Design a protein with these regions (language model features):
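A short, N-terminal "cap"/entry segment at the start of jelly-roll beta-barrel domains
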Residues: 4, 10-66, 146-147
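Conserved hydrophobic/aromatic beta-strand scaffold that supports enzyme active sites
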Residues: 53-55, 69-73, 91, 115-117
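Histidine-centered metal-chelating micro-motifs
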Residues: 79-81, 100, 116, 120-125
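Glycine- and acidic-residue-biased ligand/ion/polar-headgroup-sensing regions
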Residues: 87-89, 94-99
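Short acidic-glycine-tyrosine-enriched beta hairpin
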Residues: 106-119
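Ligand-binding loop in jelly-roll beta-barrel domains
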Residues: 120-145
Length: 147
């Protein structure tokens, strides 16, 4: 029986893949965030454009991705900034109120419990379209998320 290059190309990845995927081989990257808790009352608050933003965490995951999480409260009619785009992806978790999330020109209304997601480099914007304050969490992952 002869072994061809094709056989070797198929054999070696299959043979060694399990060794590379063992949990002990996934060593956290230097400078990654440690496991922690983030009490609400200790979160710093910023107030750009009449929004109240609580910075929850910023840093690098053990797997290398940048991560940033904050909570925003918008007054009725408020928006944190104009529509924009960036390299990292974002997810919104709506807690209270009604927001309108616009992604690449398509708008959707989201209420409590709803989730919105925007892929890297998609243009997006969010505003409070309700009559009460709207509160939501933003989870940003990818290059530039923690800057």
């Amino acid at each position: 029986m002869s072994i061809t290059r094709r056989d070797l190309c198929l054999f070696f990845p299959a043979a060694f893949f399990p060794a590379f995927m063992r949990p002990e081989s996934l060593v956290p990257q230097e400078g990654s965030m440690p496991s922690a808790t983030y009490p609400f009352e200790k979160m710093p608050i910023r107030t750009p454009n009449n929004a109240q933003i609580r910075d929850v965490l910023k840093g690098k995951l053990a797997t290398g991705e940048s991560l940033e999480v904050h909570e925003t409260t918008l007054p009725p009619g408020g928006a944190p900034h104009a529509a924009h785009h960036h390299v990292h992806s974002e997810m919104w978790l709506i807690r209270e109120g009604t927001v309108e999330l616009t992604v690449n020109g398509t708008s959707s209304r989201l209420g409590p419990g709803s989730v919105g997601f925007v892929h890297s480099n998609d243009e997006h914007g969010i505003k409070n379209v309700g009559t009460t304050p709207a509160t939501y969490f933003v989870v940003a992952v990818g290059p530039g998320a923690s800057s």
